[in-house]
């Protein structure tokens, strides 16, 4: 019996943080396995590494597993032996990926990151300007190291001529140096404690530029003082050599070698270093040595960051060589290419085809792909069943595809879900799990209803398949990722698996009613009889007939009714559950009425599904969806709708309407010639005229179309096309925009039915081309925006249930409906659904609607909005929001409210930050890029669409800036020939205070003379700078403004996003405070600190009676906010990698590994969802003898307490309105959550015996 081998080398390391710092020369020597002395790489004849060279086996380890360089020791039995002939340790070749070497430099060199970065850290700590420093480092100037008895200054910089003069004057009484040696000596001499005290004293006395410089210097000095890094470590005396397998050399076909750029860079350093050593031994003249030292400095610079200073070192074909910094930077760098995204095994990709016969939780997997993916599972089964004797023969069987393999594959595949992913994965619905069904051919079959979520179509799209291996991964796929669990959009909670195109058309045709059709008015004894009559052509699908239905009424007595409807609707109702709430079942006459007795298009289907998910839960909805899909396809086939040219009837009135419009345009032109209107007014009037004509024709056309016209039915059902397309086919094409987006005043009067003439065709070509190029640009912009949003919000996770636990006051905000003038952008109801109320709310009769700190469900929200108090559009209601959450890391479940994707209270561990970023970024592609021109010259551009969203989130000064009043008061408008001014006057403490605002040419004034305004009101039209709002009106106002503006852009495009997603991002943008006066706090003035940390420090200072720090809250754009995060790993992998790492190393930063990115980078489970600590460290002490007994009714009703899957939970949540008041359910939400956090040990299980008595 073989004993189990335990691999000693693999230790289970758990760590909670990562620290970065400067490496001291001692540390570099400690990492190293030996010094690289020669520039040689490998011997060109034997192809073996040269000794002491860049690939030396003695330093880095053997080239082949368990084999030394000279071949004396081969085979694993010599493991760990060091060969006495060649000095190579016998071990695995993979150590060549981890063992480092070093180069001892003959002269110190500076590290370019610290000398050249902005700001230059070396320059700040020495108080030298970067230019001066460069002259010293690169041997152009001398620096005084010791002034002796002369009147030179310490650290004074002398050029060649000044040095000569000083030398002639003072002789040897002073000492100068140049190059990195001199700088190193200066750095060693710095006393950080003394420097810090001096600077702090200087800070109190100085102002302006000088003060700013001192703050910058103090920051660097404090960083060195606190981190334990020594300033002289910025100068290198030893260069580390990275492992050879990370800079490989491979032989090409022609016997030539391809090598990594790193090797060239190292070779130059070694060559120059060896030459310098020789020159020093020979005692060469100073000027030659100096030149060699400068070249060595440049060689090391090129290795660390090629091209940062001077011309980059180039390889063959003038291509700059890739340095260590380039290895980390950008999309191809180490961070984004290898750490944040890796290629994985057990995956494949193929073209997708439609699989209408599949259930919604299935996908078709090609046999060849399945056998490859499930290979190890199949092999294990073969051995277990005894079909194969050992793994080797099992592998052969699988590779030869023997017949018995297929049967086993069928078994293995059962109940083992796979994940499908379509790139680009814009939101979490882009990856879903399905149960595989084996199919012939090589294409993956996809269920048509999940296409919307993947944004997939079948014109050649490809999808990737991934196989979850571990039991946990399979369980997560089944319970979280399986497509029936993803029926709702996380962005707005609407259904995502809505039937489209053919299915919609089929259902529309099925529920159509045509008066006077064959068999109208006939009676049938049952639905089946009616269907039989239809199948035999006695009645039509759309004829109104009467059918007898029988059922149990409210008293439980059987009762029959005659119901009038169409056969189609009877058929449709067979598959729809009859309690969705479309019919009021409390009325006795309705109890047998059809649930869906109306014409059903896409909009209606969406409503049906919404109600179905809310009342029946996921499993039932999935079945209904599949039934709708089958019916839809069946009847769209039966309908056999076609489109022919005769379907497009051009309205009679078209000719007259166009003639009228032409006459009107002629009149406008006449007025313009007579000087009665300006060019801009004329242009606007012409466009307006044609728009009206166009609308009129469209109206005529649509009213003239037959209700049963095929094209009309397609558009009306929502299957494909819209009024716009019908208008172009049979009305007029209308006005077109030119390439700049300005509307061409000459419309296209023809339609496609009549055909366009050459000029019209040419004009319309503009639009077609612009459409395509816009889409391409939009996709890239939208992707980049999503990336920034994810980066700024990725560490926001639900960390606790309630941040206000134990306090009386519930943090929250007053909110009201968003209005744009009279138009509602977002109603109050939309804004309060799924939030927690801060106060108890009653209706008009004083009946309780929702208790304090309980959730507002859709039904409750409807009741709140219906009550009299909320008829006023400005009525407010106080709810909990993410913006007022007091959690220190992440946010709490109650402030977030309901999870949109399940409609229930959000669970601890949900990565709400990433969901928010995806919800905002995913519709980004639909937003128009176009900057709308208000026409004409002077009209200013107001940015809209994607650029506007970007402008808001980056907190930029907007284009078309509105001027706002800094304080409230009375307005007077002065309008003279030269200038227009708005003067705001206010009286404070009996003194008149006024401020004049100059109005630029072309801006429209928004206020009236003598109007009384408030601080922060707009004086001119345009967008407001959010920073101004923050300054004048404060944080609350700017939060509201941001949410409202982002919502405006999305809602105008018809995209619905829940407020809470925008709130999450805005919370991240407003996290920092700029310290203005540090008081007795440790902060440096002018630095940014986290607002929660700032408040905590101030609270503790106040408690001690010390002076508090003063600061102003600042708003950072999302890019800046991402870089200002506590995690240097996350920031470095985002942008400006070298800058982030330079700063982090000097400060000796510690990454607490709180967010998701940093954990992905180091390869730990992410701290969200099931990877959270309190879900991972659960111990189950099971007592074998204990049984859990259910009483029978409980078991049948299935209301056992426990964490059931989202949708069952949701079903209870909706049916049972008072879900979270204690009377109805045996646990409140808090208890429900408390349980999860406990260590589930036996004492919790003791009372799990349910018995009859308790009932």
Swiss-Prot record:
GO terms for cellular component: DNA-directed RNA polymerase complex. Keywords: DNA-directed RNA polymerase, Magnesium, Metal-binding, Nucleotidyltransferase, Transcription, Transferase, Zinc. It is an enzyme of class 2 (transferase). SMART domains: RPOLA_N (SM00663). Zn(2+) 1 binds at residues 68, 70, 83, 86. This is DNA-directed RNA polymerase subunit beta'. Zn(2+) 2 binds at residues 803, 885, 892, 895. Residues 1220-1255 are annotated as: Disordered.
């Amino acid at each position: 019996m073989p004993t189990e081998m335990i691999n000693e080398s693999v230790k289970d390391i758990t760590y909670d943080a990562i620290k970065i710092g400067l490496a001291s020369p001692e540390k570099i020597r400690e990492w190293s396995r030996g010094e690289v002395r020669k520039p040689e790489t490998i011997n060109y004849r034997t192809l073996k590494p040269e000794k002491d060279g860049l690939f030396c086996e003695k330093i880095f380890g053997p080239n082949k597993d368990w084999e030394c360089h000279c071949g004396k020791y081969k085979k694993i039995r010599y493991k760990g032996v060091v060969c006495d002939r060649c000095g190579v340790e016998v071990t695995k070749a993979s150590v060549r990926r981890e063992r480092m070497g070093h180069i001892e430099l003959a002269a110190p060199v500076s590290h370019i990151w610290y000398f050249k970065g902005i700001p230059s850290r070396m320059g700040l700590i020495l108080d030298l300007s970067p230019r001066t420093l460069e002259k010293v480092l690169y041997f152009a100037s001398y620096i005084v190291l010791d002034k002796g008895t002369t009147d030179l200054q310490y650290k004074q910089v002398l050029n060649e001529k000044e040095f000569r003069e000083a030398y002639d004057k003072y002789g040897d009484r002073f000492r100068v140096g140049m190059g990195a040696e001199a700088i190193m000596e200066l750095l060693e001499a710095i006393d950080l404690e003394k420097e810090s005290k001096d600077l702090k004293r200087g800070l109190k006395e100085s102002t302006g530029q000088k003060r700013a410089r001192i703050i910058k210097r103090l920051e660097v000095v404090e960083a060195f003082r606190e981190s334990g890094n020594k300033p002289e470590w910025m100068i290198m005396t030893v260069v580390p050599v990275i492992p050879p397998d990370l800079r490989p050399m491979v032989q090409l076909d022609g016997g030539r070698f391809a090598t990594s750029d790193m090797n060239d860079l190292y070779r130059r350093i070694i060559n120059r270093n060896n030459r310098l050593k020789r020159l020093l031994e020979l005692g060469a003249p100073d000027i030659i040595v100096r030149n060699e030292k400068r070249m060595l400095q440049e060689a090391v610079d090129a290795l660390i960051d090629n091209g940062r200073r001077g011309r980059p070192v180039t390889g063959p074909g003038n291509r700059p060589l890739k340095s260590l910094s380039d290895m980390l930077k950008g999309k191809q760098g180490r961070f984004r290419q290898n750490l944040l995204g890796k290629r994985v095994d057990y995956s494949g990709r193929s073209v997708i085809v439609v699989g209408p016969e599949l259930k919604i939780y299935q996908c078709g997997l090609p046999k060849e792909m399945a056998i490859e993916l499930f290979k190890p599972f199949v092999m294990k089964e073969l051995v277990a069943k005894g079909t194969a004797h050992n793994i080797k023969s099992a592998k052969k069987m699988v590779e030869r595809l023997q017949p018995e393999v297929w049967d086993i594959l069928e078994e293995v595949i059962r109940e083992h879900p796979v994940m499908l992913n379509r790139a680009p994965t814009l939101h979490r619905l882009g990856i879903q799990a399905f149960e595989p069904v084996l199919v012939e051919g090589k294409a993956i079959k996809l269920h048509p209803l999940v296409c919307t979520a993947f944004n997939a179509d079948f014109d050649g799209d490809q999808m990737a398949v991934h196989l979850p291996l571990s039991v946990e991964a399979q369980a997560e796929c089944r319970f979280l990722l399986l497509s029936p669990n993803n029926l709702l959009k996380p962005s707005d909670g609407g259904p995502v698996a809505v039937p489209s195109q053919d299915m919609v058309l089929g259902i529309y045709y099925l529920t159509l009613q045509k008066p006077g059709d064959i068999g109208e008015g006939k009676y049938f004894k049952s639905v089946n009889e009616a269907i039989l009559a239809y199948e035999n052509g006695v009645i039509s699908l759309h004829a109104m007939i009467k059918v007898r239905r029988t059922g149990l009424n409210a008293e439980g007595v059987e009762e029959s009714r005659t119901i009038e409807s169409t056969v189609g609707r009877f058929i449709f109702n067979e598959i729809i559950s009859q309690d969705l709430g479309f019919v009021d079942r409390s009325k006795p006459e309705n109890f047998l009425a059809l649930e869906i007795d109306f014409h059903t298009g896409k909009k209606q289907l969406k409503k049906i599904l919404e109600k179905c998910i809310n009342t029946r839960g996921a499993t039932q909805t999935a079945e209904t969806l599949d039934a709708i899909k089958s019916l839809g396809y069946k009847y769209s086939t039966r309908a056999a709708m076609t489109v022919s040219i005769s379907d497009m009837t051009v309205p009679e009135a078209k000719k007259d309407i166009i003639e009228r419009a032409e006459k009107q345009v002629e009149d406008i032109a006449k007025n313009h010639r007579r000087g009665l209107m300006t060019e801009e007014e004329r242009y606007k009037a012409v466009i307006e005229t044609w728009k009206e004509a166009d609308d009129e024709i469209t109206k005529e056309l649509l009213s003239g179309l037959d209700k049963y016209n095929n094209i009309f039915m397609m558009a009306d059902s929502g299957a494909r096309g819209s009024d716009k397309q019908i208008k172009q086919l049979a009305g007029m094409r209308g006005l077109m925009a030119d390439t700049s987006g300005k509307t061409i005043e000459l419309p296209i009067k023809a339609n496609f039915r009549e055909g366009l003439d050459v000029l019209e065709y040419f004009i319309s070509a503009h639009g077609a081309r612009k459409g395509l190029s816009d889409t391409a640009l939009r996709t890239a912009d939208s992707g980049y925006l999503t990336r920034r949003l994810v980066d700024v919000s990725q560490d926001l996770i639900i960390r606790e249930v309630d941040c206000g636990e134990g306090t009386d006051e519930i943090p929250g905000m007053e909110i009201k409906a968003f209005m744009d003038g009279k138009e509602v952008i977002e109603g109050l109801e939309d804004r309060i659904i799924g939030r927690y109320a801060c106060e108890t709310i009653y209706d008009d009769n004083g009946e309780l609607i929702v208790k304090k700190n309980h959730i507002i469900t859709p039904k409750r929200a409807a009741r709140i909005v219906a009550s009299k108090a909320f008829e006023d559009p400005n009525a407010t209601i106080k709810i909990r929001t993410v913006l007022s959450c007091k959690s220190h890391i992440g946010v709490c479940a109650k402030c977030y409210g309901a999870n949109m994707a399940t409609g229930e209270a959000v669970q601890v561990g949900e990565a709400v930050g990433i969901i928010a970023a995806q919800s905002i970024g995913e519709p980004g592609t639909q937003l128009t890029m176009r900057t709308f021109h208000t026409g004409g010259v002077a009209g200013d551009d107001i940015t809209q669409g994607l650029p506007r969203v970007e402008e808001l989130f980056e907190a930029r000064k907007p284009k078309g800036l509105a001027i706002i009043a800094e304080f409230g008061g009375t307005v007077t408008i002065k309008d003279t020939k030269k200038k227009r001014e708005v003067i705001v006057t206010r009286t404070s403490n009996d003194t008149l205070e006024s401020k004049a605002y100059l109005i630029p040419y072309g801006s429209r004034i928004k206020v009236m003379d003598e109007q009384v305004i408030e601080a922060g009101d707009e004086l001119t039209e345009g967008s407001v700078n959010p920073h101004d709002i923050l300054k004048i009106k404060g944080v609350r106002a700017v939060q509201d403004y941001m949410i409202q503006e982002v919502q405006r852009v999305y809602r105008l495009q018809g995209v619905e996003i829940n407020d809470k997603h925008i709130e999450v991002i805005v919370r991240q943008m407003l996290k920092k405070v700029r310290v203005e006066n540090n008081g007795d706090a440790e902060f440096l003035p002018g630095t940014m600190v986290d607002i929660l940390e700032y408040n905590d420090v101030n609270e503790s200072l106040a408690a001690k009676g010390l002076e508090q720090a003063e600061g102003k809250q600042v708003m950072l754009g999302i890019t800046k906010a991402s870089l200002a995060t506590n995690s240097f790993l996350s920031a470095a992998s985002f942008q400006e990698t070298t800058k982030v790492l330079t700063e982090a190393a000097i400060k000796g930063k510690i990454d607490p590994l709180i967010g998701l990115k940093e954990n992905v980078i180091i390869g730990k489970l992410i701290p969200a969802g099931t990877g959270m600590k309190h879900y991972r460290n659960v111990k189950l002490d099971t007592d074998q003898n204990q049984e859990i007994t259910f009483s029978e009714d409980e078991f049948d009703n299935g209301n056992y307490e426990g964490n059931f899957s989202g949708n069952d939970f949701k079903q209870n949540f909706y049916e049972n309105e008072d879900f979270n008041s204690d009377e109805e359910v045996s646990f409140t939400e808090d208890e429900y959550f408390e349980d999860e956090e406990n260590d589930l040990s036996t004492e919790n299980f003791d009372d799990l015996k349910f018995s009859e008595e308790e009932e």
